[in-house]
Amino acid sequence: MKKAILSVSNKTGIVEFAKALTQLNYELYSTGGTKRILDEANVPVRSVSDLTHFPEIMDGRVKTLHPAVHGGILADRNKPQHLNELSEQHIDLIDMVVVNLYPFQQTVANPDVTMDEAIENIDIGGPTMLRAAAKNYKHVTTIVHPADYQEVLTRLRNDSLDESYRQSLMIKVFEHTAEYDEAIVRFFKGDKETLRYGENPQQSAYFVRTSNAKHTIAGAKQLHGKQLSYNNIKDADATLALVKKFDTPATVAVKHMNPCGVGIGDTIEQAFQHAYEADSQSIFGGIVALNRAVTPELAEQLHSIFLEVIIAPKFTDEALDILKQKKNVRLLEIDMTIDSNEEEFVSVSGGYLVQDKDNYVVPKEEMKVVTEVAPTDEQWEAMLLGWKVVPSVKSNAIILSNNKQTVGIGAGQMNRVGAAKIALERAIEINDHVALVSDGFFPMGDTVELAAQHGIKAIIQPSGSIKDQDSIDMANKHGIAMVVTGTRHFKH
């Protein structure tokens, strides 16, 4: 029977994953809070102390730091000497390590954190197990992100958990532990940048970097311009997160944390033009992110309008010369690598909330046409573009999009009809190829009726209302194609 060690601070999905492992004939070992939650869910699990024959000591500071754990993880199964030594010491092989670390970054993000609290959230045993298992990836599966649970289970079931995939998991581990260690160094060095002010001039603010990874705002290379403001940093982060969703050349413009224009194209110049045309008024004074290098031709277009921040993976020398003619525009060079499914958190009175990032993308084949009329190919393209954008828009959110750009955005309204009215009234075009995209279900048929009055012929929405059929009937009445995804994307 294969053995797995599970010790996680982020409990998302761990019970379901553990149950599936037991069904796949894995014997589970765990520690502390992870073991408690598995016990409560009646998942068969043993204490790591059953491996080490040594109790947890020092309030849990020493749990897994033991040869019985690390010998079982690090043994090279192709070396008879390693296996003989394990046998002599009565040490069992460990086949899987599932670990994520104490929430150090979240802890130190609290401005009132004490030194003792920070120190107690420095994980020792977790990184040690992760690094050991990652080093031995040829024989051991290492999982650090809950987002990888399902893929691992799928591969276990179809016998495709091969060395190449385990190597990809190994890379994620070393990226994760490197960022974790860097966050610790930055905190104890006092690595925080005082900003001119916060969201408003009467608010003081500073920027604490918990990572210097090149794919993050914190790790961006600023090539030109004034110091980033508090609002610049928030807007830039939102812009970057959205533009990374696109494989094709794409441009995203953001104002006040909401996209105002998103465009794609065969070239990055086309993509920018489409984003600009989506809302040429709101882009003024905004943040723009592009997922391709900025060329001289594109730089001339960008230079012609007032922008606070321009983000790209690269700027050519000639493009920099053009853009630097404006002394204040901030130019950020950022690696466009997709973020892992890290947690995000927000402070509230007396604490903070933590959740996984909303990175889930419903595959097209899992979406369902629920109307008599099916979408055309062009309507499908419009829907899929809008569905990538809508999670980045404040709820209630309605987007209108064609297959190359957003054409109208209604954001942050207290009711869905209100959001639809704004999107429809601001639309730069409405025709048979434009889709209406909703981040949440329609509580009744009125939004669909309003869309029909404006000539909309395709709608995509999550569904889930007890009155879903009213919206479907309304769509059928007006010959509208409707697709449901089963997944909502609220953003507060």
Swiss-Prot record:
Pathway where it operates: Purine metabolism; IMP biosynthesis via de novo pathway; 5-formamido-1-(5-phospho-D-ribosyl)imidazole-4-carboxamide from 5-amino-1-(5-phospho-D-ribosyl)imidazole-4-carboxamide (10-formyl THF route): step 1/1; Purine metabolism; IMP biosynthesis via de novo pathway; IMP from 5-formamido-1-(5-phospho-D-ribosyl)imidazole-4-carboxamide: step 1/1
Protein name according to UniProt: Bifunctional purine biosynthesis protein PurH
Keyword Hydrolase attributed: yes
One GO process term, biological-process aspect: 'de novo' IMP biosynthetic process
GO terms for MF: IMP cyclohydrolase activity; phosphoribosylaminoimidazolecarboxamide formyltransferase activity
Record keyword Hydrolase present: yes
Reactions listed under catalytic activity: (6R)-10-formyltetrahydrofolate + 5-amino-1-(5-phospho-beta-D-ribosyl)imidazole-4-carboxamide = 5-formamido-1-(5-phospho-D-ribosyl)imidazole-4-carboxamide + (6S)-5,6,7,8-tetrahydrofolate; IMP + H2O = 5-formamido-1-(5-phospho-D-ribosyl)imidazole-4-carboxamide
Key words, A-Z: Hydrolase, Multifunctional enzyme, Purine biosynthesis, Transferase
Domain MGS-like as annotated: residue spans: 1-144
Any one GO cellular component localisation term in the record: cytosol
Record comment regarding domains: The IMP cyclohydrolase activity resides in the N-terminal region.
InterPro entries for the chain: AICAR_Tfase_dup_dom_sf (IPR024051), Cytidine_deaminase-like (IPR016193), MGS-like_dom (IPR011607), MGS-like_dom_sf (IPR036914), PurH-like (IPR002695)
Family membership: Belongs to the PurH family.
EC number of the protein: 2.1.2.3, 3.5.4.10
Cross-referenced PROSITE patterns: MGS
